[in-house]
């Protein structure tokens, strides 16, 4: 166990809560102390839902530990069933309650209810949130479909109907899942493919029973749905797709794979380059500015892998770092990083990720909410591509990541920080020209240039002071800092570190303009 300020994933019962809250007519009884009820805020504050999660907490206290906590659990289970009348009941325990070993799932099954009861055994001290969500979804599907017949059914061609697919994996607190589902439904409809069930998002236990009516399962989020898709293929003979449609190339590959599995002819429109604005821009002269930009990528496995492909193949970026916090996806991320000449960063320590960002000196960071803060401290543009996220990454507007429109959104989210960074750098370069003299009139009208000079100096001073000066460190002179401020902000930190290292090696106590250029010549030699 380690003490940390931030964590990429919560304990596995948070993953179970995500599944329960995503579904309808389902209730989750969680054996947990009062302090574990904080999880409600994740859905009401970040996801901005208008209702509480369908979760009943036993909320035991210290004084209850001296009595029969099993009776406390049974009382809450009965109250939840009588009050909410769910079609199925999930029963589990939090990391704290796991230590008591009351086994609430076994207690619930012995109470004689006539609804399916899914007992969740989630090892809180060895697994995390995404695994908990995956295991919960798997147990729900397995429990409800375990008695389903394995007899082969007629194909969609024999039944003379349109092909049907299930979209599996989207959940609440997933990255743009709501909009991804709408985009993929729209995309499949254009090719004559119907959606049978979307699960767990918006599905009820009755919908889970309809999963076998589909011809193919589409695994949209492997972290949540892959184990379920594998079980459905083995036990119910329902094949599933493995390509996640994130980006133009991946969307094309996804459609080709799906058509092949369904034994449909692949239409020529799949390969048309005008499906997304990203392709048009990548072929335009304006995109030359972006070619070769250094990008660092970190997030959940699905989005990190997709981002690496988009950056490398579709936007012409140079990927200088690739990693994930999801150990379940590490097996897929490592070969992808190796193909780019990198060593994958597999860690759940955000400070280790920040150190890797410093070391690689990227011009753009694609990561989570944590990397946004790290990039801000380092003065590097950043776009959030993965959970964990904050409320600003759950837009009220339609903003998918998958499909053609998702590629457009990705293009905007990634390119705009770089373009605004260019504008900031140009202003920094030419701020001494007569058009930028502080006394001149500005767009602020009567305020003119008052206060601009001090603000600019403070901003430069803040950007420059990104390391703590110790007794052995060389000191920057005013001329040296002034010259350093002319260097683009996205490489300024690297130049500063290299110059300081050179000054230490050369025995310089002060870094002036001449030292800066000597260091430049030294590292270029």
Curated annotation (Swiss-Prot):
Sites where the protein binds [4Fe-4S] cluster: 36
Cofactor annotation comment: Binds 1 [4Fe-4S] cluster per heterodimer. The cluster is bound at the heterodimer interface by residues from both subunits.
Involved pathway(s): Porphyrin-containing compound metabolism; chlorophyll biosynthesis (light-independent)
Location of the active site: 286 (proton donor)
GO molecular function, one term: metal ion binding
Positions that bind substrate: 421-422
Reaction(s) this enzyme catalyzes, per UniProt: chlorophyllide a + oxidized 2[4Fe-4S]-[ferredoxin] + 2 ADP + 2 phosphate = protochlorophyllide a + reduced 2[4Fe-4S]-[ferredoxin] + 2 ATP + 2 H2O
Entry's Gene Ontology BP terms: light-independent chlorophyll biosynthetic process; photosynthesis, dark reaction
UniProt keywords, alphabetically: 4Fe-4S, ATP-binding, Chlorophyll biosynthesis, Iron, Iron-sulfur, Metal-binding, Nucleotide-binding, Oxidoreductase, Photosynthesis
InterPro entries in the record: ChlB/BchB/BchZ, LI-POR_suB-like_C, Nase/OxRdtase_comp1, P-CP_red_C, Protochl_reductB, Protochlorophyllide_Rdtase
Subunit-structure text: Protochlorophyllide reductase is composed of three subunits; ChlL, ChlN and ChlB. Forms a heterotetramer of two ChlB and two ChlN subunits.
Membership in a protein family: Belongs to the ChlB/BchB/BchZ family.
Protein name listed in UniProt: Light-independent protochlorophyllide reductase subunit B
Source organism (scientific name): Prochlorococcus marinus (strain NATL1A)
């Amino acid at each position: 166990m380690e003490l940390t300020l931030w964590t990429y994933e919560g304990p596995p019962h948070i993953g179970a809560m995500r599944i329960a809250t995503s579904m309808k007519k389902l209730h989750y009884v969680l054996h947990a102390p009062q302090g574990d009820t904080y999880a409600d805020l994740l859905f009401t504050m970040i996801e901005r839902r208008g209702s509480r999660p369908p979760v009943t907490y036993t909320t035991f206290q210290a004084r209850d530990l001296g009595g029969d906590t099993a009776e406390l659990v049974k009382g809450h289970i009965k109250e939840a069933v009588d009050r909410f009348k769910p079609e199925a009941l999930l029963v589990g325990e939090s990391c704290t309650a796991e230590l008591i070993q009351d086994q609430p799932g076994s207690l619930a099954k012995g109470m004689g209810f006539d609804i399916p009861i899914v007992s969740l055994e989630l090892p809180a001290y060895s697994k995390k949130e995404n695994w908990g969500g995956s295991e919960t979804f798997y147990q729900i599907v397995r429990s409800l479909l375990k008695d389903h017949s394995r007899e082969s059914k007629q194909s969609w061609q024999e039944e003379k109907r349109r092909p049907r697919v299930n979209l599996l994996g989207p959940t609440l607190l997933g990255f743009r899942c709501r909009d991804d589902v709408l985009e993929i439904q729209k995309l499949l409809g254009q090719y004559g493919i119907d959606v049978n069930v979307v699960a767990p998002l918006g599905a009820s236990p009755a919908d889970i029973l309809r999963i076998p009516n589909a011809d193919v399962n589409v695994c949209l989020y492997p972290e949540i749905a892959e184990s379920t898709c594998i079980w459905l293929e083995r036990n119910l003979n329902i094949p599933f797709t493995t390509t996640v449609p994130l980006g133009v190339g991946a969307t094309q590959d996804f459609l080709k794979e799906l058509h092949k599995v369904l034994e449909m002819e692949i239409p020529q429109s799949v390969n048309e380059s005008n499906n997304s604005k990203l392709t048009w821009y990548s072929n335009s002269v304006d995109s030359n500015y972006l070619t070769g930009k250094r990008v660092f990528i970190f997030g959940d496995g699905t989005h990190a892998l997709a981002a690496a492909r988009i950056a490398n193949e579709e936007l012409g970026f140079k990927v200088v770092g690739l990693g994930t916090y999801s150990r379940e996806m590490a097996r897929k991320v490592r070969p992808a990083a190796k193909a780019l000449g990198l060593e994958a960063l597999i860690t759940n320590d955000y400070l280790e990720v920040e150190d890797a960002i410093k070391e690689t000196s990227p011009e753009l960071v694609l990561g989570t909410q944590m990397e946004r803060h790290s990039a801000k401290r380092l003065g590097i543009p950043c776009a959030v591509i993965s959970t964990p996220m904050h409320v600003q990454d759950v837009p009220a507007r339609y903003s998918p990541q998958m499909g053609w429109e998702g590629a457009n959104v990705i293009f905007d989210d990634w390119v705009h920080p770089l373009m605004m960074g260019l504008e900031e750098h140009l202003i920094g370069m030419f701020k001494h020209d007569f058009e930028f003299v502080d006394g001149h009139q500005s767009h602020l009208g009567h305020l003119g240039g008052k206060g601009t000079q001090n603000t600019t100096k403070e901003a430069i001073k803040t950007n420059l002071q990104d390391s703590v000066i110790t007794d052995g460190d060389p000191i920057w002179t005013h001329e040296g800092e002034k010259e350093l401020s002319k260097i683009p902000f996205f490489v300024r930190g690297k130049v500063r570190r290299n110059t300081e290292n050179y000054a230490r090696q050369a025995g310089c106590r002060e870094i002036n303009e001449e030292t800066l250029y000597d260091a430049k010549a030294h590292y270029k030699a």
